[in-house]
Amino acid sequence: MKEVNVNEVPAGAQLIDVRETDEFAEVRADGAVNIPMSEFTSRVGELDQDRDIYVICKLGGRSAQVGEYLEQRGIDAINVAGGTDGWVAAGLPHTTG
């Protein structure tokens, strides 16, 4: 599975945030779509497999697990190292609350 840092995610990318709903509500990368890890297997059909799939969480652990899940099913995924914490720290566009 490919991994990029937060600064390498292109504008307008399909960015899937796998944190739980309450975490996503607190702070999120602008444009991210929330599909919590706990719901991921039942919602994987929501992904646009014709576009690159960037997966993000808080720091990079859960997103790596989801990325591995996708790769095992023949779906390419890109893990965003540093996660939402790194995204915010880098000053990238995000929403709080």
Language model feature labels by segment:
Residues 1-14, 18-52, 61-97:
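Rhodanese-like catalytic fold shared by cysteine-dependent sulfurtransferases
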Residues 56:
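Short, surface-exposed ligand- or partner-binding patches at beta-edge/loop junctions that are enriched
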